[in-house]
Amino acid sequence: MEKEPKTMLRFGTIGTGWISNSYVDGALDSGLWQLTAVYSRTKEKGLAFAAPYGVKTVFTDLEEMAATDKIDAVYIASPNKLHIEQARVFLEHGKHVICEKPLSAHAKDVAELQALAKERGLIYLEAIMFMHLSLIHISEPTR
């Protein structure tokens, strides 16, 4: 029996700092993700981040990036205060969102975007490493 080929998830990243490199490297190592776009406030920084990954598409306009058909999802690693509005833009354009912590300082904002994602059949989640949470380690002996 032949296995179905794995579908690559095309994603873009917002943010060009070290955490973005770390996330992108892990995503690419999985063999399931393809970095296809980068957003930065300046074209120069965006191009510098994109070059080692062979990415040619760099945006300086979020709406433009959200509207592109070159991505299925976005990874948000911008300053915390921008997370909610940036996530909203991408969810409204039908893109899955993975956002660095915190999603927001306000639970009502998160609940609103969770509802929007659910309504549109999208994934909206916080990029958090569960394996390092104490709850995971506490539960391990019971497995």
What do the PLM-derived regions correspond to, one by one?
Residues 112-129:
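Rossmann-fold dehydrogenase core element
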Residues 20, 59, 99, 124-126:
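Hydrophobic residues in well-ordered beta-strands that form the structural core
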Residues 34-37, 72-74, 124:
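Short active-site oxyanion
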Residues 1-53:
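N-terminal Rossmann-like dinucleotide-binding module
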Residues 53, 93, 119-120:
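Helix C-cap/helix->beta junction micro-motif
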Residues 46, 86, 113, 138-139:
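Aromatic/hydrophobic pocket-lining residues that form π-stacking "cages" and hydrophobic walls in ligand
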Residues 56-114:
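Beta-loop-alpha module in the N-terminal Rossmann-like domain of NAD(P)-dependent dehydrogenases
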